């Protein structure tokens, strides 16, 4: 597309050079800029990418969007605008033909449950033999093809490109985890959502948002906007077991469907049966009750299942077909995942990294603990430490607790474990500044019949170390190797 057409609907402060330039690609990453690229510079929290503009010109880029005129050598056009990231969103949606308008788009937000709900929606579509895409913590997936991702919600240009990829793959639907960071930073500008889903709101990310009020406001942006096309039929799915749903219902102009277990809602789960093999419940709806069976473990996953089913149903899919699909779903990797049931211990990994998430995790596994519950939890570096002692307190619901760092980054691992230990309510705990050593210790002290839970990371494949270097790390592989060495069996046996 010619740059003059690309900027036709955008008011700019100044243009230095000509807009008669062919633009084939838009990027905010200077490393990927090349001939035919339009580079958008921005002043971030830690880096001002305006300083890379000369680099992109040297790489062949002929046009840059900046918030001030720069001294650049070479044949380059500068487009000066007040808010470069807002313009980046507008340009990306224009160049890539407004991809979110071309499929059914689901947005899932909440402190806990985003990955599970979003993955369930994606898998329901696949079980119904429909092309589908997923974007979130576990990366980007079109049908069964997966690629890794850096953030839950990518920056605006990368996000638009992913939606375009889904459209090009003939996806009928795309489900996105929508983070509070992504909403607050405007990464979702221009995305047209058809259904917005809320799981819950508990303390997290206050290192970024500052207050729970600001955190909640960021979440609410998804429900008050859902895009700019007010003529489309759109829906909001809210968890009535969380009080914040009342506020979200008040700020959205769209039809609301509520679900719940403990609080009255339009859709409810009753007569619940739980085991480490899954859940069964009666799904009570405004138009009848339906038995549901799923391999997902834990009462909190019943809430996630209901949210996913309602979201897909709201866009016209038959509920019986959805329920049949749910019965066949594979559990979400790293979310209350039981590793190798043939082991004489129950070895479980989970992503729970907040006090609320840990409480729900322990609630889910405790009824099935035969002997001791050994619980390992980590605290991330450079994060909100005010939540840390409460995490330590919740962890002490277990018989034996292991405190470790989780992505310590530039923080002292010993400081992180000490913060967790401040909340300890008994003395049956130990601190390790090396998470892998903590995992091996958990297996070493476990006896047949014990349950070992490795919390905080799920299947995250790295530890973020000093200098923000990512070092390969897998809780599941470390735990399984230690278990096979102790109890025998398994492909990881030495």
From Swiss-Prot:
UniProt protein name: UDP-N-acetylmuramoyl-L-alanyl-D-glutamate--L-lysine ligase
GO molecular function: ATP binding; magnesium ion binding; UDP-N-acetylmuramoyl-L-alanyl-D-glutamate-L-lysine ligase activity
Gene3D superfamilies noted in UniProt: Mur ligase, C-terminal domain, Mur-like, catalytic domain, MurE/MurF, N-terminal domain
Modified residues annotated as N6-carboxylysine in this record: 219
GO biological process terms held by the UniProt record: cell division; cell wall organization; peptidoglycan biosynthetic process; regulation of cell shape
Motif L-lysine recognition motif, residue range(s) on this chain: 406-409
Binding locations of ATP: 110-116
Reaction catalyzed: UDP-N-acetyl-alpha-D-muramoyl-L-alanyl-D-glutamate + L-lysine + ATP = UDP-N-acetyl-alpha-D-muramoyl-L-alanyl-gamma-D-glutamyl-L-lysine + ADP + phosphate + H(+)
Keywords, alphabetical: ATP-binding, Cell cycle, Cell division, Cell shape, Cell wall biogenesis/degradation, Cytoplasm, Ligase, Nucleotide-binding, Peptidoglycan synthesis
GO cellular-component term (any): cytoplasm
UniProt subcellular location: Cytoplasm
Annotated residues for binding of UDP-N-acetyl-alpha-D-muramoyl-L-alanyl-D-glutamate: 30, 152-153, 179, 187
Keyword Cell division: yes
Main location per the UniProt record: cytoplasm
Family per record: Belongs to the MurCDEF family. MurE subfamily.
Pathway assigned to this chain's UniProt record: Cell wall biogenesis; peptidoglycan biosynthesis
Function: Catalyzes the addition of L-lysine to the nucleotide precursor UDP-N-acetylmuramoyl-L-alanyl-D-glutamate (UMAG) in the biosynthesis of bacterial cell-wall peptidoglycan.
Post-translational modification: Carboxylation is probably crucial for Mg(2+) binding and, consequently, for the gamma-phosphate positioning of ATP.
EC number of the protein: 6.3.2.7
Organism listed in the record: Staphylococcus epidermidis (strain ATCC 35984 / DSM 28319 / BCRC 17069 / CCUG 31568 / BM 3577 / RP62A)
